Design a protein with these regions (language model features):
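Register position in tetratricopeptide repeats
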Residues: 36-37, 70-71, 105-106, 139-140, ...
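Start-of-helix register in tetratricopeptide repeats
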Residues: 25, 59, 93-94, 128, ...
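Alpha-helical linker/edge segments of TPR/alpha-solenoid repeat scaffolds
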Residues: 75, 105-110, 179-181, 193, ...
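Alpha-helical segment of the N-proximal tetratricopeptide repeat
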Residues: 22-49, 53, 66, 70
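Short coil turns that delineate tetratricopeptide repeat
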Residues: 55, 89-90, 124, 158, ...
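Canonical tetratricopeptide repeat
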Residues: 63-66, 97-98, 132, 166, ...
Length: 340
């Protein structure tokens, strides 16, 4: 009996030691759980144990860098991202992303741009590298570079809401209003009810409502805002100004603000679609074709009500009597992709 009991204790001791040691994947998995609970120091301790087993584990080194970054210990975070990059095995593109972020938050945005550019030479299909490059470029007021990077980002992942949102801000900052509005519509279609939605929706409504400036020209006539450098889209911006002014027309007096919003949106999409003809370029192919098709398929009303759902119960009330319209739009939306 004593032999059996002793053997059992020995087995339990060995088994307990094996469990405490763990394999590299097990230690990393447990470390990630701790990281997700914001227990970063404890997570790093487990990752370090994994490195004691396999010091060349790219995953363990990357997770250590990630936890140090979360702790705002940027020196150590950078140290371990460089280890991952030097190992040149796995998680290299993620390490470049993290390294660029570290450089950005530590006041080295130009170095971050170099890091992203270097990474994109090796990983030209990494969407997040393009997005981070765009974000840093935007913050440096390098708007053309941001615009170019965001176009690449959306060609890889057209459902990346943040790229649509940042592209909208980039275009509006450059006074390219029509392009910015199109990107805002797409963002709101993807994120109709998030923390960013209210500001995006407010911006969209403001951009759709303006067009004729408050100031007047020397002749006393109202002037139309917009960027004349892009004549094609500038024409569409003039039409937006006309639409904004038409709200006071006798024929529109009994219409709700939501009805006018849907009508003006549909007109905007239609005008751009009819203007396109043989025009080429990212915005014409990616956005104009997409939203013109929505107008042609009679889905604009559904889109407009869907994207305002964060404001109040307007969408839910509309849905009560228009469910078939929303279902038809939803079916179309799941099948139709952007072109570029």
């Amino acid at each position: 009996m004593k032999k059996i009991f002793g053997s059992l204790l020995l087995f339990m001791s060995l088994n307990s030691g094996s469990f405490a040691q763990g394999t590299v994947p097990e230690l990393i998995a447990e470390g990630i759980k701790l990281h997700d609970k914001a227990m970063y120091a404890d997570a790093i301790e487990l990752y370090q144990k994994a490195l004691q087993i396999d010091k060349r584990s790219a995953r363990a080194n990357y997770e250590i860098a990630s936890s140090y970054f979360a702790m705002k210990d940027y020196i150590n975070a950078l140290k371990y991202t460089d280890i991952v990059i030097a190992l040149n095995v796995d998680y290299i593109d993620q390490a470049y992303l993290l390294k660029g972020s570290i450089q950005d938050v530590t006041g080295q945005p130009l170095e971050a741009l170099k890091t992203y550019a270097k990474a994109l030479q090796k990983y030209p299909n990494n969407q997040l590298l393009y997005y981070n490059l765009a974000l840093t470029s935007f913050n440096l007021k390098q708007y053309k570079d941001a615009e170019n990077a965001l176009q690449h980002s959306l060609k890889i992942d057209q459902l990346h809401a943040s790229s649509h949102f940042l592209l909208a801000l980039t275009m509006l900052t450059q006074e390219k209003r029509a392009q910015g509005i199109l990107a805002l519509y797409n963002f709101l279609l993807l994120e109709p009810n998030s923390k960013r939605t209210p500001s995006a929706l407010k911006t969209l409504e403001e951009e759709m409502a303006k067009g004729v400036q408050d100031k007047t020209s020397k002749s006393g006539a109202a002037t139309v805002s917009g960027n004349k450098d892009d004549d094609d889209f500038y024409t569409a911006e003039i039409m937006l100004g006309v639409l904004a002014s038409s709200k006071q027309n006798e024929s529109n007096k009994n219409k709700t603000a939501m009805q006018l919003f849907a009508e003006h949106t549909n007109y905007f999409f239609t005008i751009l679609g009819e203007m396109k003809k043989n025009k080429k370029g990212f915005f014409w192919n990616f956005y104009v074709d997409y939203f013109y098709t929505i107008a042609q398929k009679n889905h604009t009303e559904a889109l407009c009500y869907y994207i305002v759902q964060s404001k109040d119960d307007t969408y839910n009330k509309w849905l009560e009597t228009n469910l078939p319209k929303m279902e038809a739009f939803s079916e179309w939306y799941t099948k139709y992709l952007h072109k570029f």
